[in-house]
Swiss-Prot record:
Gene: lpxD
Protein name, as recorded: UDP-3-O-acylglucosamine N-acyltransferase
Organism expressing this protein natively: Chromohalobacter salexigens (strain ATCC BAA-138 / DSM 3043 / CIP 106854 / NCIMB 13768 / 1H11)
Assembly mode: Homotrimer.
One Pfam assignment: Hexapep
GO biological process, one term: lipid A biosynthetic process
Catalytic activity: a UDP-3-O-[(3R)-3-hydroxyacyl]-alpha-D-glucosamine + a (3R)-hydroxyacyl-[ACP] = a UDP-2-N,3-O-bis[(3R)-3-hydroxyacyl]-alpha-D-glucosamine + holo-[ACP] + H(+)
GO MF term set: N-acyltransferase activity
InterPro entries, sorted: Hexapep, Hexapep_transf_CS, LpxD, Trimer_LpxA-like_sf, UDP_GlcNAc_AcTrfase_non-rep
Pathway: Bacterial outer membrane biogenesis; LPS lipid A biosynthesis
Length: 347
């Protein structure tokens, strides 16, 4: 495991890493990554949005990551590439001072079952619990207070931040990142009603999480009732997201904060759900669907594209007037229909 040390790279090294065209001194060293406005003489910055072109001439950065068409006003060295934002993503990982920082080994306060299997170069933090039959892959970091339930598996090079709970019978793929407070494999919301009260339905399935998945803090993915809840490869899930039992999320999809997906709904690959989106149960969203924030989806979507529902914010007085008119729409429609029938009967 790496220790916390300052990051320093020459512009030549970064250009080679990013496959960028360097205009400037290849031996110039940079030690940080910052915005156009905040960057100092030892930093590299980036320009990925033309809105910020006006700030480029005044940046104090040593170098800027920029599209070839937008860097002519740069007062510093340039690393030119077609997708500066993607380049910024890679730079952010290079300059992350905490990347890989964790002491190798099992902390004395951790509880590890005899039948659990711990891979090589693993860090298990204070107060962790690794239950019977669990498998922790090579290079994993299990943060303080995290629990990996019986017969669950954490794939190689994954990281569980502090206080993550993985229930029994859960499979997490390689290179996953699970943030603090997320819960994988809790019981789904399953109950039968007899007319008087509720009777619990045991949730007998599991959860399968693919490779390269990131799950935000305080998000919940429930185990299947029968069969598994499945999260595909390279899925990105924001904080405070609720995914119910037997949901399936396709590869490369992204869910923003506070999304809620009811049971047995299937979301295709390359889908994007904005913040606060709600999906009713037993629906299917095809590949390539984008749903804008706070929308409610109550029917399946079979064509890729952008979908929205709801009403955007407006001054309260106008909203109240429109709300009153909305309540009158049914009666207005009936009156219009009667008028149209009367007009058609007129010679």
């Amino acid at each position: 495991m790496k220790t916390l040390t300052p990051c320093a790279f020459t512009l030549g090294e970064l250009a080679e890493r990013l496959k960028a065209r360097l205009v400037g001194d290849s031996d110039r060293r940079v030690t940080g990554l910052a915005t156009l406005l905040d960057a100092g003489p030892n930093d590299i910055t980036f320009l990925a949005n033309k809105t910020y072109l006006k700030y480029l001439p005044d940046t104090r950065a040593a170098a800027v990551l920029v599209h070839p068409a937008h860097g002519t006003d740069a007062p510093c060295a340039r690393l030119e590439l077609e997708n500066p934002y993607l380049g910024y993503a890679e730079l952010s990982r290079l300059f992350d001072p905490l990347a890989g920082q964790a002491p190798e080994g099992v902390h004395p306060s951790a509880v590890v079952a005899e039948s659990a299997r711990i891979g090589e170069h693993v860090s298990v933090g204070p107060q962790c619990v690794i239950e019977a039959g669990a498998v922790i892959g090579d290079g994993c970091v299990i943060g303080a207070g995290s629990i990996v339930g019986a017969d669950s598996e954490i794939g190689a090079d994954s990281r569980l931040h502090a206080n993550v709970t993985v229930y029994h019978g859960v499979s997490v793929g390689r290179r996953a990142i699970l943030h603090s407070g997320c819960v994988i494999g809790a019981d789904g919301f399953g109950f039968a009603h007899d007319g008087q009260g509720w009777h619990k339905i045991a949730q007998l399935g599991g959860v399968i999480v693919g490779d390269d998945v990131e799950i935000g803090s305080c998000s919940s993915i429930d185990r299947g009732a029968l069969g598994d809840t499945v999260i595909g490869n390279d899925v990105k899930i924001d904080s405070q997201v609720q995914i119910a039992h037997n949901v399936q999320i396709g590869d490369h999809s992204a869910l923003a904060g506070c999304v809620g997906i009811a049971g047995s709904t299937r979301v295709g690959s390359h889908c994007m759900l904005g913040g606060g989106v709600g999906l009713s149960g037993h629906l299917t969203l095809c590949d390539g669907v984008q749903v804008t924030g706070m929308s409610l989806v109550t029917n399946s979507i079979h064509e890729p594209g952008v979908y929205s529902s709801g009403t955007g914010a407006m001054p309260n007085g106008l909203w109240r007037k429109n709300a009153v008119r909305f309540k009158q729409l049914d009666e207005l429609a009936k009156r219009l229909s009667r008028l149209e029938r009367g007009a058609s009967d007129t010679p």
